[in-house]
């Protein structure tokens, strides 16, 4: 093994019967075992923002049969969308090897979410109700939240008005960049006012003119 190096090299002469004919000087030499080169190639990985990290795996080239690689890879810290380098971490094959590490990246991709404005409306002349929305696909991660307000196109005449995204934003500590946000507009409808007219009962004497009808 490398740890046991250097080893002493000595010579044995034969046949032993002829040694008396020589004046022999013994000079020793060292036999050194150098570490074997081992290539560890990290596998590229990816995940969606907010999900746990996948297992970090690798491919080994040059390992002697029976020997093992222990320890684990690590990646650079961070949970926002982007690429993070995978490093050798605690990987080791022992003192008999020198590791050449080929790095890779763990890529965090955006989290998809769909927000739809709820359809709403009012009677002409009334104040606008609060505009609301629903998450129809996907979800928020961690303690992320949504803030801001929807808006509708201006107008007070009878008809339909689009409800738009307005100032709605996702608070994720990264300017909302950790999400792939799809916004679906809603419809705000201004309707006619319903007017009920109730006629008052009336009567007359036969042959007389009709009275004035009231309501």
What are these regions (language model features)?
Residues 1-215:
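Solvent-exposed beta-strand/loop surfaces, strongest in extracytoplasmic domains of secreted
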């Amino acid at each position: 093994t490398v740890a046991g190096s250097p080893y002493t090299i000595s010579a044995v002469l034969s046949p032993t019967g002829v040694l008396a004919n020589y004046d022999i000087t013994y000079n020793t030499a060292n036999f050194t075992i150098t570490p074997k080169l081992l290539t560890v190639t990290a596998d590229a990985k990816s995940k969606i923002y907010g999900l746990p990290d996948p297992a970090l795996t690798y491919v080994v080239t040059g390992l002697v049969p029976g020997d093992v690689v222990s320890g684990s890879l690590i990646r650079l810290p961070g949970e926002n969308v982007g690429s993070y380098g995978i490093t050798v971490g605690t990987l080791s094959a022992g003192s008999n090897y020198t590791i050449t590490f080929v790095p890779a990246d763990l890529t965090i991709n955006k989290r998809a979410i769909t927000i739809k404005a709820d359809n709403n409306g009012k009677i002409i002349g009334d104040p606008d109700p609060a505009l609301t929305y629903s998450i129809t696909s996907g979800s928020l991660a961690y303690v992320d939240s949504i803030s801001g307000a929807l808006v509708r196109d201006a107008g007070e005449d009878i008809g339909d008005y689009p409800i738009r995204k307005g100032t709605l934003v996702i608070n994720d500590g990264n300017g909302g960049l950790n999400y792939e946000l799809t916004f679906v507009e809603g419809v705000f409808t201004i309707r006619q006012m319903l007017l009920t007219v109730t006629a008052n009962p009336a009567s007359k004497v036969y042959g007389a003119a009709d009275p004035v009808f009231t309501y």
